[in-house]
């Protein structure tokens, strides 16, 4: 029998739907089993959140912040357990998941600052009375979390939503339910009132029931572009509901004149292969100049890529890359590599899959001669190389995508960067830094098929509350001068 994995109105209960499980993707051992939440249980979660809303929203910001800070204390106290749980379900090495657990704590202070600076009260004097701007919570919001950062990314929606006074229904990825369960238990220990956060676990049917529920006032999503587009279509014609989408990318990294080729190779690897290529900001396309300088960089990159250590999350000698999220995801990367070869690509470093596991080795594939390159996000460690003669040509080809999440330039030329910054279409643009690097205090998100709004702890404040403009006077009073045509005795 599976265990209670649904958290509704402050109570843990067993799902009434189909059974699902999560595995350690390194070996396919089952580490979590539960039954999905049904549409009726999703409805109960929405009702609980609605019932809890006014009491939570009526608390002062200081009172809400006190509970959120208690959650931060729980995160610190249980950081190693959280890091291990994330590693078990995602396959990422512990050095990475420990960083993720720490980032969850960091978002608390950033979210506090954001609320005060972006959604606080503003008063302006008027000849009679005052003009006020205040912010109010939307109400009941659904948060959909991804599998690649199952703690950190949902946290970037949930914390600012709660601080603003919303109540939440959290639907995590079905691939990382154990992380979600642990996170909710830490919220429970922090003293969060019943109904303020509700957890509904399950697969597609559970997610559809939540996304389609008429009782939610908004939906905050981090995940694939495909699912995000489905949600956007589903929400069409509902302008009264706030929809925040952070989706994928087909991200370019361009190299021009650089002196330190060793540093360039390092930043390319960090951009393309960290988290086994399962960051939405990972470099998918590498643009190298033709000629000897580009040749040297490519040769060094090939050598360094072949030397990347891939291994288990808990190896004493920590690997750079762990497992991908599943054997199916890993097999999908082999399929993508083969499809590119059929289009005319040349494999420079073969991506290889250890069958029945999520392990793959990183791959590099030369794609310059593919005339009609597919605009697909291959979510894994497969880097496509394009050679160029002209910088503007490279930028044009980098922009030839429906996505627009992250982009980067490695160059010793400030003029090149200024030109690149003006021309490139992306929400995150880095210079001489890996393009996977981002700050929770900065806007995180893109344009086009990469989404709307900015899902980070700081800028999330913008979509977690709406502004209310008021003109106010403490007592009803006649104006000093009446409008023309008025006479009031």
Curated annotation (Swiss-Prot):
GO terms for biological process: arginine catabolic process to glutamate; arginine catabolic process to succinate. It is an enzyme of class 1 (oxidoreductase). Transmembrane segments: none annotated. It catalyses: N-succinyl-L-glutamate 5-semialdehyde + NAD(+) + H2O = N-succinyl-L-glutamate + NADH + 2 H(+). Pathway: Amino-acid degradation; L-arginine degradation via AST pathway; L-glutamate and succinate from L-arginine: step 4/5. NAD(+) binds at residues 223-228. Catalyzes the NAD-dependent reduction of succinylglutamate semialdehyde into succinylglutamate. This is N-succinylglutamate 5-semialdehyde dehydrogenase 1.
